[in-house]
A protein has these predicted regions:
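Acidic catalytic loop of the alpha/beta-hydrolase fold
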Residues: 211-216
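Conserved HGGG/HGGXW glycine-rich cap/lid loop of the alpha/beta-hydrolase fold
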Residues: 11-64
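Short beta-strand/loop motif that positions the catalytic acidic residue
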Residues: 201, 207-209
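Flexible "cap/lid" loop of the alpha/beta hydrolase fold
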Residues: 100-108, 113-145
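Active-site loop/oxyanion-hole signature of alpha/beta-hydrolase fold enzymes
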Residues: 37-44, 53-93, 252
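Catalytic histidine-centered segment of alpha/beta-hydrolase-like enzymes
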Residues: 238-251
Length: 262
């Protein structure tokens, strides 16, 4: 079921809900420059046993572009979706930008989540200067330059992304992401830093990192695992979009983690 929902700012978010009506809920949050379609392997594997909620992050897919966004805004969109769907509590899984969103939610809204999964992310991703520069470049020149090199960051060199349908679909979603939506997310990430707060996360936390990830590294994952009390760390032989490159392994790790909590 596809739903267009309003957030607290009156802007529209594109949401999809599948699975049994009264099952436990798991929410998936996409990475920068993608849309909710990136989770289709996980949705297919889990929708028989969970009520699965995916959504296009603001400025991506079919969701509205919202200017002057922050990490708090990205996270509060999730709370607005839960409230709109009358979901009291859920499991949450985010990758990259969705992963740091998970951290913020774990810090500020632990009562709304059974657990968070932080995939291919960090408590501080890249640098403020780097993100601001990228935002300005995209606004001036569009996304073509980003699209041309994105496979080198998203996928391992040995992964045949060219002949992988979902990988190609995900790259295509980057080409259709609004430049302003992408830039606003870059600006939000420029100021997103929860390093001083993640020790306060009190709910079970799964950290998944890609062995070959040049963006959010194994060291980033190890640092988070040391700081977050109830956390587990798994390293997957993949790059930045590990849920696509190693979809079965990713889903297996996530499912096992959730089953231990249920």
């Amino acid at each position: 079921m596809k739903i267009m929902m309003s957030n607290r700012q009156g802007k529209t978010l594109a949401v999809t809900v599948t699975g049994p009506e009264h099952a436990d809920v798991i929410v998936f949050s996409n990475s920068l420059g993608t849309d909710q379609g990136m989770w289709q392997s996980q949705v297919a594997a889990l929708e028989q046993q969970f009520k699965v909620v995916t959504y296009d992050t603001r400025g991506h897919g079919q969701s509205d572009v919202i200017e002057q966004s922050s990490l708090q805004n990205l996270a509060e969109d999730v709370i607005d979706i839960l409230d709109g769907l009358k979901i009291a509590k859920a499991y949450f899984c985010g990758i990259s930008m969705g992963g740091i969103t998970a951290l913020w939610l774990g810090i500020h809204y632990p009562e709304r989540f059974y657990s968070i999964t932080v995939a291919n992310s960090a408590a501080k991703i890249w640098t403020e200067e780097g993100w601001i520069s990228r935002a300005n470049t995209v606004l001036e020149n569009g996304l073509a330059e980003i699209v041309a090199t994105t496979h080198t960051r998203w996928f391992s060199h040995q992964f045949d992304y060219f002949n992988h349908a979902l990988a190609q679909q995900t790259i295509q979603s980057l080409t259709t992401t609004p430049a302003l939506g992408y830039a606003e997310s870059c600006r939000a990430l420029a100021h997103a830093d929860v390093r001083d707060e993640i020790e306060n996360i009190s709910i079970p936390t799964l950290i998944i990192v890609g062995q070959n990830d040049p963006v959010t590294t194994v060291a980033d994952g190890e640092w988070m695992q040391q700081k977050i009390p109830l956390s587990e760390l798994f390293v997957i032989d993949a790059s930045h979009l590990s849920n696509i490159e190693q979809s079965e392994k990713f889903t297996q790790i996530l499912s096992h983690f959730i089953l231990k909590i249920q």
